[in-house]
Amino acid sequence: MNEHTPQRTARRTRMVRYATTATAAAGLALTALAPTAASAAPRPDSVQQRLDALVKDDGMPAALATVKGRDGRSRTYTAGVGDLATKAKVPVDGQIRAGSNTKAFTAVVVLQLVAEGRIGLDTAVDTYLPGLLRGDGIDGRNITVRQLLQHTSGLPDYLDAPALADFVPIQYRYFEPRELLDGALAQKALFAPGADWMYSNTNYLVAGLLIQKVTGRPYDEEVTKRVIDRIGLRHTYVPAPGETALREPHPHAYLAAEPGVPRFDYTEMDSSMAWSAGAVVSTDTDLNTFYSALLTGRLLPADQLAQMRTTVPAELLGPGVRYGLGIQSRPLTCGGLAWGHGGTSAAHKNRGGVTEDGRAVSITVTTVPDAPTAKHMTDAVDAALCR
């Protein structure tokens, strides 16, 4: 759900808080066996090695990945166990809660509506949702749609509201979007609109309300019609109100725990707390398909895709990271950029990216890791795209 700052993540060890808090620690050194005169020993698979390390060295219950190589072929990977209680295997390409990858889906729908002339990127939010955004330093007449999508609105994050301070008691609780928004509006604005950049889930909560107001249809129906069905994401969906279980084979996922404390199974949850900022369920393969389709123009006209890829510095997400409209770019060690978003739910973390030449990778773990482990995930994405 939240791809945010390290300070906020530290506040919540057992729940989702920003996936993109990441930083620190070093990657794994990969070695290859030298060939002999008689035969060459098989080269260890670097992706599998890194997933194994996320489980063995970093303590993740499970890790899953799908990698699409330079040859256009995809390969899936798993490590760890799918259920800590039964030690069941991790389902290959199992369903996961995609967290803030949802923001890219939401941004696509908004930009499609821009292309249709129904929304103006630089039009005030108040034009479409009059009177909705009012608070201490907050005024929807001064916040544009672009600023929502780019996290430059100054809106505070609703995840910082007291009602969301502990995920355990709200595992099965339904939240109306307005209730979440009220938690944000009770806080002071982070800065004047356009004056700075700060990741805030509230921006995409408002974007979901904007979609509903302009189309007259539920958010989930618009995302399904305009994105999921359009490019054939067969294992991706927006959970219905009250739907708490995942629909297809999946690994169990757990709240992060203090050392010595048993992990709390958070596989089931009411995802209304994330809604248009982080509720999408998907698989690593479907996420690769989505971002590849997005970058190749299958979801947006050229003008809107160019707007989406117009970025501002977002160094809080990592060195060299820049944020566009619902997607971010990250420099690769081998040159070029990886485009995507990544996401964290209460008990999943995903990292990934696609390149201009069609390479793609998505990696997911089944608990929210600390900053060094999150850095290992980012390093694994880089290594997979650069090999």
Which sequence ranges carry the predicted segments?
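Hydrophobic (often cysteine-bearing) scaffold residues that line and stabilize catalytic clefts
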Residues: 43, 47, 98, 102, ...
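Catalytic loop of the DD-peptidase/beta-lactamase superfamily, centered on the K-T-G motif
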Residues: 2-3, 38-78, 262-387
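Short, surface-exposed loop or secondary-structure junction motifs
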Residues: 137-338
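Short active-site loop at a secondary-structure junction
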Residues: 58-61, 86-146, 191-200, 275
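Solvent-exposed coil/turn segments that connect beta secondary-structure elements
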Residues: 82-84, 153-154
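Secretory targeting and sorting signals
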Residues: 1-40
